Regions:
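A cross-family phosphate/adenosyl-ligand binding-site feature
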Residues: 1-187
Length: 187
């Protein structure tokens, strides 16, 4: 894993690869986040992963994700004077985006590094995509609907909401990790 410090602005043409921040929240599908990192690498992205504290508590294989990204997962703020472990992003993805994170993000409640990273992304001028994983009952809550509308108004690109519920034939759909890349790579 690299502890290198890279100071550059988003979209810096002097860099060979693009850098993607991946924010992972605590939902059952988080176990598949390695698919996103692998797909990002195939498309020429380097990745840095931020996780909510709850997501770190068994929702995905942290050792595998660190091995895939080549960098430590971040979930806590660095101390003053510590180097930045990731360069600034060229794009930011939150997948899966949970009810709690979407609502905190829209309200600017940066109580975790993961949510603070999303809040800051609005001011960076880079593409931001969200792949929500929210149950129907929670999605019906007015706060969630308002939060999605507010974030869309800020330019966040949302994929269709994933519920994980089986279809009429009893088949559970797959979480489409690559959709996050499609969203941030749109012109």
């Amino acid at each position: 894993m690299s502890d290198r410090t890279v100071d550059r602005r988003p979209g810096d043409p002097d860099r060979d690869t693009r850098f993607l921040y991946v924010v992972v929240c605590a939902a059952g599908v988080a176990s598949g986040v390695g698919e996103l990192i692998g797909a990002a690498r195939q498309r020429g992205w380097e990745t840095g992963v931020f996780a909510t504290p709850t997501a770190l508590n068994g929702f995905f294989d942290t050792a595998r994700v660190e091995a895939l990204s080549g960098r430590p997962i971040r979930s806590a703020w660095r101390r003053p004077g510590d180097p930045r472990p990731f360069p600034p992003p060229d794009a930011v993805v939150v997948a899966p985006a949970t009810f709690n994170t979407v609502n905190k993000w829209a309200q600017g409640l940066a109580d975790t590094l993961a949510v603070a990273t999303l809040c800051e992304a609005a001011g960076l001028g880079v593409p931001v995509a969200a792949l929500p994983c929210v149950a129907d009952a929670l999605a019906a809550h007015p706060a969630y609907r308002d939060s999605v509308a507010r974030l869309r108004g800020m330019g966040v690109r949302f994929a269709a909401r994933f519920t994980g519920e089986p279809d009429e034939h009893g088949v559970r759909p797959e979480f489409d990790w690559k959709q996050a890349l499609d969203l941030v790579e749109q012109p």
